[in-house]
């Protein structure tokens, strides 16, 4: 049995990220998912001044205050979602405030059903399982795409 230290695990993760980046340049991964309602937490966090400014700075758009959530339902899409964990993406750093720490967020440019700009966001602190994808856009995506819970969407993620 081999046991890795935290430092060793970090080094392996960085190596894996480098390999994914090397082989995934200009790659598009597709994720199929079904729209689902969230708990409204995305709205709360996206509306915080730090995140609103950071998303604008790092993603190039002022996001609608909320996320669209979708649940992955097939194996290939889940594998593509897990690939995002190994990819660098755009890192929005954590932010320390007097009473709390706002966690970092990894983001990827994307489109949904050919609509952009969109970003897949992966907060380091989340209550969602990996099968739930959170999406940001300057648009209220439910209205723009006329989506209801259970509707299927195709997300193209640009690595």
UniProtKB/Swiss-Prot annotation:
Enzyme class label: transferase
Cofactor info, note text: Binds 1 Mg(2+) ion per subunit.
SUPFAM superfamilies linked: Riboflavin kinase-like
Pathway: Cofactor biosynthesis; FMN biosynthesis; FMN from riboflavin (CTP route): step 1/1
Ligand binding (FMN): 126, 134
Pfam families given in the database record: CTP-dep_RFKase (PF01982)
Names of required cofactors: Mg(2+)
Keywords: Flavoprotein, FMN, Kinase, Magnesium, Metal-binding, Nucleotide-binding, Transferase
HAMAP family, per database record: Riboflavin_kinase
Name this protein carries in UniProt: Riboflavin kinase
The gene coding this protein: ribK
